[in-house]
Amino acid sequence: MMGYFWALMSVLLVSGAQLMMKWAMVSLPPVGQTDALMSAFMSVTPGAVALVIGLFAYVFSMGCWYMALRRIALSKAYPLLSLSYVLVWAAAIGLPWLHEPFSVGKLAGVSVIFVGLLLVCLPDKKS
């Protein structure tokens, strides 16, 4: 059971990292504008903070993933990563500052991912 806890923590952290990185990339100046980008980091702007938090979330996610893989089979753990696609999509649609459009086609695709996850991760019925 702890393996699933660690896998879920990894998924939540990596999902949060994706959202923070997206927000940071929208908030920060382009990489080509070196002076403006450096100024954003030196001034500790919200975009720079979001970038650092996102990177740390990735690092902690890797630690959680390590703990998960020590406890559950890769064939069960790896499909759980697809839950991140579902969470990031739903959050991106729901968070107004990301300006992500909703579409029925994308909802269908995310639903297929979620159903596939259930099929892989639910216990097999023994006959």
From Swiss-Prot:
It is a multi-pass membrane protein. GO terms for biological process: lipid A biosynthetic process; lipopolysaccharide biosynthetic process. One of its GO terms (cellular component) is plasma membrane. It is found in: Cell inner membrane. Keywords: Cell inner membrane, Cell membrane, Lipid A biosynthesis, Lipid biosynthesis, Lipid metabolism, Lipopolysaccharide biosynthesis, Membrane, Transmembrane, Transmembrane helix, Transport. Pathway: Bacterial outer membrane biogenesis; lipopolysaccharide biosynthesis. GO terms for molecular function: carbohydrate derivative transmembrane transporter activity. InterPro entries: Flippase_ArnF, Small_drug/metabolite_transptr. Residues 70-77, 123-127 are cytoplasmic. The chain crosses the membrane at residues 1-21, 49-69, 78-98, 102-122. Residues 22-48, 99-101 are periplasmic. HAMAP family: Flippase_ArnF. Heterodimer of ArnE and ArnF. Translocates 4-amino-4-deoxy-L-arabinose-phosphoundecaprenol (alpha-L-Ara4N-phosphoundecaprenol) from the cytoplasmic to the periplasmic side of the inner membrane. Belongs to the ArnF family. This is Probable 4-amino-4-deoxy-L-arabinose-phosphoundecaprenol flippase subunit ArnF. It comes from Enterobacter sp. (strain 638).
